[in-house]
Amino acid sequence: MKITFVQGDITDQAVDAIVNAANHSLLGGGGVDRAIHRRGGPEILAECQKLRQEKYPDGLPTGQAVATTAGRLAARWVIHTVGPTYAESKDKSPLLADCFRNSLAVADELGAASVAFPAISTGVYRWPIVDAARIALETVRASDTQVAEVRFVLFDRRGYEAFTAQESSGEG
């Protein structure tokens, strides 16, 4: 699998699937979630509402992943996953790893060859970017997936540098 890094807007990526750092409600939130819903259009929200009614009445559990249309985005699908909130008092890194692992499993079910990930949980959920990069890269590399390209799309320079430094250190 090829792993690449881009500093930019995940909603601009022409890949098979874009991963959304969603909240439990699946009904749109802030950050990446808001941008994906805004650019993708009402089709994404309509499918999320249907998923809430039919499969996830209590919301999507942390670490799980589910796909919808990508609406007007350049991608074919959006894979929604709910990252954990960072807490120094409790190790939630297995849940963060689950976000990447389960998103890749959904991508495999869809037949996606290319997937773009944001830095899940590093915004309002306050996960330290260097640790998030390590978990993301370790998990993606260890995943048994048919996905040919994983692209990490980092919104700012700090995120981009954290991910590329982790990659070049060989620790991730």
Regions found by a protein language model. Name each.
Residues 1-110:
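Glycine-/small-residue-enriched capping loops at alpha/beta junctions
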Residues 85-172:
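Phosphate/ribose-phosphate-bearing ligand recognition and processing surfaces
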